Swiss-Prot record:
Signal peptide: none annotated. PROSITE patterns: RIBOSOMAL_S5, S5_DSRBD. Keywords: Ribonucleoprotein, Ribosomal protein, RNA-binding, rRNA-binding. GO terms for molecular function: rRNA binding; structural constituent of ribosome. InterPro entries: Ribosomal_Su5_D2-typ_SF (IPR020568), Ribosomal_uS5 (IPR000851), Ribosomal_uS5_bac-type (IPR005712), Ribosomal_uS5_C (IPR005324), Ribosomal_uS5_N (IPR013810), Ribosomal_uS5_N_CS (IPR018192), Ribsml_uS5_D2-typ_fold_subgr (IPR014721). This is Small ribosomal subunit protein uS5. It comes from the Bacteria. It holds the Pfam family Ribosomal_S5. Part of the 30S ribosomal subunit. Contacts proteins S4 and S8.
Amino acid sequence: MAIVYNRVKSTNDLELKDRLVAINRVTKVTKGGRTFTFAAIVVVGNEDGVIGWGLGKAGEVPAAIAKGVEAAKKNLIRVPVHNGTIPHEQAASYGGASVFLKPATTGTGVKAGGAMRAVLDSVGVTDVLAKSKGSSNPHNLVKATIQALAEMRSPLMVAQNRGISVEKVFKG
C-alpha cells in the first residue's frame, strides 16, 4: 500500500512556531584563508498536529535560521494527535538513525531526547515514549521522526480504508 502523506497546502491560517534543532559551522579552506558558513536545521509546527522541517545555509547564523524556517513552511504535513499522544506505535528509520514512538498515558510527558523532543513538542504531542537507535545525527533523527509521524493513521482513517466502523477497528 502506498503511503499518502497528509500535506498541508496553505500556511496562511496557521500560527507556526519555529524551533532550532542544530547549527553546524562549515569551514572551507581556500588559498585566501578560511571561509565559514552555517547550516541550521529548523522544525516548525503549530502544536496542534502540523509539522515541517527545513535546512537553511548561509554565511551568518540568523540568515541560515531564516532560510530554514522558510524551507520548513514549504514542507508541512498533518499528523493525527489524540488527547496529547499518538494513535499507535510506529517505527521508522532514515539513514543510520532509527526511531521508535509509543503512545503514553496522560501525565507521562515527552520521554525523548534532543532532536526528537523538538519535533514532538512542535507537533503538539504532550505524552509519548520515544527511543532512538543508531546514529544520533540531528538531521537524520529529525527526518526519521517526521517520517514516523507521517506514517501515523488515526482510527477513523483506518476504518475508512478498511470499510468498517471505528468500533470494529478496536474490538476486532
